[in-house]
Amino acid sequence: MTSKKKLCYALLFMSSFSFGQSSSDQLKELINSALERDGQYQQQNLELQYVDIDQKRLTDTFLPKVELTGRVGYMDTRINYTSPEFGIPRVPPLFPGMMVPSQNNTLGISGFSGVSKLQASVVLYSGGKVGHLKKALNEKKLSQQELLSSSKNEVITSIAKIYDQFALVHQSKKVLDESKKRLEINRKTAEKALGYGLITPYDFKKIELAQVTLDTKMVEYEGKRELLITQLHILTGMDKKRIAEIEPDLQVLNYVVEDKSIENRPEIKALNHGIAAAEYKIKAEKTWWIPKVQLSTSLSYFGLYGDHIQTSNDVVPYLVKKLDIHTKPLSLFPMFNAGIGFKWSLFDGNTGKREAEKSKIDKMVLENKKADAQRKLQLNLANNQTNYDIALAQIELKDKARKIAKNALDQVEKEFRYGVKKSMDLIDAENDLEKAELEYKTAVFNQRRAAIELMKSTQNLDVEKF
């Protein structure tokens, strides 16, 4: 294989890789990129992580809690006391007896002490509250996932609209290019007719003016195209050059509503899960009076070091001298304790009752929102169905109009060549066709908008169908 052939194959491969994507693939890539950059969508994703953490915290309720505490300190205690006066009877002839006088004394104890404790506890039964709260959180998570789906629908709709606007501008360019070609051909015909005296210079200038007007529309087209490229760049983060290479197609989007139920709408599903979460919350609050059971155990240590025990006077006058003792270290270990305890709230000051009442009101609020949403979404479905039917009818009418305009232009061009029609008639016919073509493209754009809104009405958005 020669170098030239290798180069040709390489260029062919690169071209097919760059432009081989279908319109559906291009749109999906734009939507996925937009979802990664959409602030509200990402915020809701983060809020879902909060719920995950709350679920883990509830599960952790039944995990053991282990604590190790310790304390080392210096102790210095003084006890003031007065010993009573008492007598010792005599024991003849061994002991003559004696009186022991009353005496004020101070007992002092000083030294270092150390205490440590290892304690473990685990909840065995929460009264059913944790179980109900876990179910409530699960429903809350499902509700937020539905709201996330709703935000995704909005991003899809927004990007699809800009994509179709991009396609409409692209199709408009083709219409303008066709008009430019026809005007150039008719201009050459007009030059010959002017040379033969079949038309006046004024008629010829009219054709030149039409060409300038068309060039102005071309400039407007470039401005609109650049604006749409910038919009897609900001929303998706994709490179402008890559977006500029997209050549979207604008085709009629047919859709038939098979199921007219709105119950699959994420807004309704989110409210259903919210109502279920409120029900579990009510059940959880009603468990306030059920006893909670906990298992606990501990291992403790107590020690005395460098203790000094002393008195200011004799402990017993004449009999027991004053104390001045330095003791050896004293320790108590192990001190082990284990058992099962319970907590039974016989009356909590109506706290649990009031919380249950609040949860009931929350449930009623959600039920009212659901009823209101159902009415509005049902009306929205009917409105979108009507708009879709009108949009389809508009396409049929606009298609007939452009065919009539095309036939009229063909007839005027023939008559212009034979000098029967003036240049103004030709320009009017050209403008009529251009307008009819653009109105047809706009009708297709509007029909696609109506079809996508109708899909969204019953939660049947499918990018593959776009």
What are the residue ranges of the model-derived segments?
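Residues on the lipid-exposed face of transmembrane beta-strands in outer-membrane beta-barrel proteins
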Residues: V72-Y74, L118-V122, L232, L299, ...
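Bacterial Sec-pathway N-terminal export signals of envelope proteins
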Residues: G20-R78, D239-K240, A244-K283, I290, ...
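Structural signature of outer-membrane beta-barrel domains
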Residues: G73-T77, Y125-G127, S300-L304, F347-G349, ...
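Sec/SRP-type N-terminal targeting helices
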Residues: Q42-L46, T59, S110, L124-K152, ...
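Periplasmic alpha-helical coiled-coil/stalk elements that build and connect Gram-negative outer-membrane
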Residues: S3, E29, I53-Q55, E154-K269, ...
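Short flexible linkers and secondary-structure junctions
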Residues: S22-K161
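Primarily recognizes Gram-negative and organellar outer-membrane beta-barrels
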Residues: Q21, R37, E67, R71-I109, ...
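Acidic, low-complexity, intrinsically disordered peripheral segments
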Residues: D76-N80, E85, E439-F466
